[in-house]
Structure formats: C-alpha cells, structure tokens
Swiss-Prot record:
CDD domains linked to this entry: Ribosomal_uS17
Record keywords, A-Z: Ribonucleoprotein, Ribosomal protein, RNA-binding, rRNA-binding
Taxonomic placement: Bacteria, Bacillati, Actinomycetota, Actinomycetes, Mycobacteriales
HAMAP family: Ribosomal_uS17_B
Highest taxon of the lineage: Bacteria
InterPro entries: NA-bd_OB-fold, Ribosomal_uS17, Ribosomal_uS17_bact/chlr, Ribosomal_uS17_CS
Gene that produces this protein: rpsQ
Name of this protein: Small ribosomal subunit protein uS17
Record organism: Rhodococcus opacus (strain B4)
Amino acid sequence: MSEEKAVSTEERGSRKVRTGYVVSDKMEKTIVVELEDRVKHPLYGKIIRRTSKVKAHDENGVAGIGDRVQLMETRPLSATKHWRLVEVLEKAK
C-alpha cells in the first residue's frame, strides 16, 4: 500500500515593496516611515504629493531618523505594524 503524499505548492501573494524616509525611531524595534505617493488629480490633472506614515519592524535597530529605507509588506506583527525593514538605502547626513 503506497500512499501518495499530496504536496500543496501554495504560492504566497506578491508583497508590496515601498521606499520612504524614517521620521521616528523612538520605539524599540519599530520605526515610523513616511511614504510618498504621487497621484494625478482626477479633474485638474495636477500631480499631487500624498504622504502616509506606517510603522515598520526594525529587528536590529539599524535605521535612524532621516534615513532612506526600503520596506516590504508582511503579516501583521502588531495592531498597527504590517511592514518590515528590508535595507537602509541611504544614511542621513
């Protein structure tokens, strides 16, 4: 009696990757990053800057205020934290 093991190759969805600037690093293992989105006004056509702040997980505490960082979407780590730090692209001067 040979049983075939059903291997489910469940693919995870593509995760969003965003770039932004660190505006706060006062929490332990958490940074606040400001993400900028440029959208076109639906009626007038002008390009508008829209910003949003997200909390991201910084395991080693390497990012500081003013650093340009790359974030990746992840599972919910807390009530407000759904992003994690991938790398620091540019340190603040």
